[in-house]
């Protein structure tokens, strides 16, 4: 489950890896997004209190934040919170304000870093599930259906399956239980309901149901937190969504859920420990776990990556900065250009003059650029996550067939082989007669 939030860092217990890496990752986010061309806005957040007990929780969070080094924290009364966010409930008695919290496009955040790695020589082996791991004189042999990979060092960052991957080598010292979170994605007509991330007081199961703007002008609402046995269960439920809706209305009573355009769910990797698991196996030196990365995992990711580099250096691996580092090629965002810039781009490539996705003003040129990017998509959802085609109010009802045709043309495959998402999600069952 991912809310596209760059968390401030007041929630984790001081002294934990989670606390340190959350604050470090938050500080890194702005520079990374600016450098890689990722949509990001440091909008700030409010944690709401509706009773005296929750006011005490805010005080605890404030003290944690101070200990963790979170900048600019302030405790507000209810009137102060509503002065910032007029659509908050009159029942709000107090709030914790964290100006360093932000919102980001989570797919592009991850893709931009991955594409930069590919541009600089990293090879991705996608659709290659790990089936076995064995020790060798030189380190490890990782087996997949598409071949075997010899490595001196292995980093296990397999999300909710991290404990299962570790078990292919040896018994892991932890277990992971998936926790499902369900969401509403609201139309842009609701985007102005709040300008900051609105939290309720956190509990043991998570940071609670939030209401937040997105970098694309929508509103995201959710999630709940429900332990599920199936590590692939990302289905939504009537009961879960009803809970999210009821809880969110407590914070922002004016939300119009008739403007919902999409429901979805995701899974958090909840481990049997109360912290991120970032360590080398004692029994198998050279095998590292980066596991149990639940919230604030997205925020912490850049800092976790830096820690992985540090772990390798501690093993004596000589790592030098690449002298001819290649910057990521930024894709044009047609809707964000001025009229003069749009005209110049169309003169250069006429495909930018053909709008395919009307809801988000995404052009054929942008879709083609995504399909020929360093990590090209092969599905409608893959295109959507890279350039937003199909992300708007109609959710691909208008542009979906056109995007499908462009994918087939650019990849040189029959249109009936174009997928919606993962393997097997075919859109066309057979040719019409």
List PLM regions with ranges.
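Helical element adjacent to the flavin cofactor pocket in flavoenzyme catalytic cores
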Residues: 96-153
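Conserved small/polar residues in nucleotide/adenosyl-binding loops
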Residues: 433
